[in-house]
Amino acid sequence: MVTIRLARHGAKKRPFYQVVVTDSRNARNGRFIERVGFFNPIANGAEEETRLDLDRIAHWVGQGATVSDRVAALIKAANKAA
């Protein structure tokens, strides 16, 4: 099953997440099909906290991809801000 979820990157105690489309059987930071955005939970100042390609996310959801709870919350916040 294809899912849209977060892959953790960054340094210890400084997480940075990529929003990726991947097979649910792959490891959290493993192989992915497409990168559709990022989320920086510790962004400050002029740094961008979230960037999502909502068109590609809609495409993958239309293809049957499931969305993780956290990514669904990020999408909801992005739609609210736009």
Curated annotation (Swiss-Prot):
Keyword match Zinc: no
PROSITE patterns associated with the record: RIBOSOMAL_S16
Listed GO biological process terms: translation
Pfam families: Ribosomal_S16
Keyword line: Ribonucleoprotein, Ribosomal protein
Gene3D superfamilies, alphabetized: 3.30.1320.10
HAMAP family in the cross-refs: Ribosomal_bS16
Gene Ontology molecular function: structural constituent of ribosome
GO cellular component, one term: small ribosomal subunit
Species of origin: Klebsiella pneumoniae subsp. pneumoniae (strain ATCC 700721 / MGH 78578)
Family: Belongs to the bacterial ribosomal protein bS16 family.
Name listed for the protein in its UniProt record: Small ribosomal subunit protein bS16
